[in-house]
Amino acid sequence: VEKYLHHYAEPEILALDGLPDQLSWENVMVIPACNESSGFLRTPPPCDGRSLMILVINESVTAARNVSLRNQALATAVQERFDRLWQAAPGSGLSLWRDPLAARDVLLVDRFTQDRQLPAKGGVGFARKIGADLALSLIHQQRISSTWIHCTDADVSLPQTYFRSSNKLPVTEQKVSALIYPFSHCDVQERAESSEVIEATQLYELSLRYYVAGMKFAHSPYAFHTIGSTMAVNAIHYAKVRGFPKRAAG
């Protein structure tokens, strides 16, 4: 883990050096957000202590103006709803916010303002890696009790058992590298704007399940979903594979 953090982690982890000593959490989740509304800031799934959401608001240098405006609105929503706990050194893009209504803090990562945007070929993988690297650093510092880096997206509705499912695993279990949460595209009928969107969503989910079914039929050891928004990664194994790929998804 130390080798990964020293040689391969993103530079945002260096800004954590000034984090107050008394701050710690039970669980962590990483959310890369681009062009999202603030609806996902609702009450998080419960855990035995406080949870930490690492929110990486991001856009590429080629992003349209409307994307920049939506990202700024999301950052403003965090700053208005939550109480500031800590601000990293100027230019680092990190700040920590406490939810006054839930046992949850938000580590806000700015990768969308001028001079902090992702490169043109950077995408959700890059943003997810930034967040996961920060989570790994905090786990290594023993500020986060769980060794699982939970990864999800802003448009995902999480079950109440989200954190508790991983917390049930033995602390000493190091053979399990990742967890895949079951998923479905919910409320498509109510929220879709047209029958074409409904059909496209259903076909997309069918293709995901068909692929895994085909891999299972072929007796492949890789017969599982690899969707960034539905997984949790063991911190040690995350470091062994040198983190998430930086490329855009798709």
Model-derived segments and spans:
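A recurrent flexible, glycine/aromatic-enriched loop bordering the glycosyltransferase active site
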Residues: 212-232
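Donor nucleotide-sugar recognition loop
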Residues: 242-250
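Short beta-strand-to-loop acidic/aromatic patch adjacent to the donor-nucleotide binding site
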Residues: 139-159
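Active-site-proximal specificity loops/subdomain of glycosyltransferases
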Residues: 5-8, 66-146
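Short glycine/serine/threonine-enriched helix-capping/active-site loop
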Residues: 56, 111, 179-182
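N-proximal low-complexity "stem/linker" segments adjacent to membrane-targeting elements
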Residues: 1-52, 56-62
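Conserved donor-nucleotide/metal-binding helix-loop-beta segment in metal-dependent transferases, i.e.
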Residues: 160-182
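Short beta-strand-to-loop element that shapes/binds the nucleotide-sugar donor at the catalytic cleft/hinge
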Residues: 175-198
